[in-house]
Amino acid sequence: MKVTLIVILTCAAVLVLHTTAAEELEAESQLMEVGMPDTELAAVDEERLFECSVSCEIEKEGNKDCKKKKCKGGWKCKFNMCVKV
């Protein structure tokens, strides 16, 4: 009877440890996936910077004051650059 109880408790402990390790691996893999879009965000930021500076340069050449273009998604034009609000 004691041997059966020890075997059951050992199996339960192994199952808990295995489940915990699997959850940790899944969390790590999700963190790795979250890190991937950073390069995509950098490309979007560069595009916003380019659009903002180009629109200001075009307005300056037309002898008009540079009206800063409103950047979308929480960004605004400042000093011919899009900056996060």
UniProtKB/Swiss-Prot annotation:
Expressed by the venom gland. Residues 23-48 form a propeptide. GO terms for molecular function: toxin activity. It is found in: Secreted. Residues 1-22 form the signal peptide. It comes from the Eukaryota. Pfam families: Toxin_20 (PF08089). Its main location: secreted. Disulfide bonds join C52-C66, C56-C77, C71-C82. Keywords: Disulfide bond, Neurotoxin, Postsynaptic neurotoxin, Secreted, Signal, Toxin. InterPro entries: Hwtx-2-like. GO terms for cellular component: extracellular region; host cell postsynaptic membrane. Monomer. Neurotoxin active on both insects and mammals. Belongs to the neurotoxin 12 (Hwtx-2) family. 02 (Hwtx-2) subfamily. This is U4-theraphotoxin-Hhn1a. It comes from Cyriopagopus hainanus. The lineage of its organism: Eukaryota, Metazoa, Ecdysozoa, Arthropoda, Chelicerata.
